[in-house]
């Protein structure tokens, strides 16, 4: 696999590899974590579209499986929420013309990651100095005065790019 900038960096620590979207390191981490266990974790995080788990390989971390932006944003919001997943919902409450509540969403949150793991991932994704070798100083991923965790990605052949970002109170993709 190639990195987006076509540069191979050799050994690199996980913080810098994740912050800079180093593809070779991502494949190694998936290999060490185990594909099936990683797919279970992805499902726990809210990624529902990876249904036929036997069709994926190590290139899954490079876009080898179709995942909707809504699923990705939902999964990253779990990191923002210290490891607790709150399923996304389109309608919170339905009221009649008099304000009487007819139906109301009842959240069913679940802890899917240890808090220290979620906080470490958030810290890495918000580490602007760790991103700098790949994205530059105060790149478009930097938000002055705010700790914003950000992850980028590209589609095959680099035709499209995406960005997910979050704070403890907001996740966008």
Where are these regions (language model features)?
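Short helix-capping and inter-helix turn/linker motifs at the boundaries of alpha-helical repeat units
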Residues: 50-52, 112
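Short, surface-exposed loop/turn microsegments at beta-strand edges and helix-strand junctions
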Residues: 52-53, 166
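Active-site-adjacent helix/loop patches that line small-molecule binding or acyl-intermediate pockets
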Residues: 2-47, 54-79, 124-127
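A penicillin-recognizing enzyme superfamily signal
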Residues: 16, 66-173
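Short coil/turn segments at secondary-structure boundaries
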Residues: 30-33, 40-45, 53-57, 87-92, ...
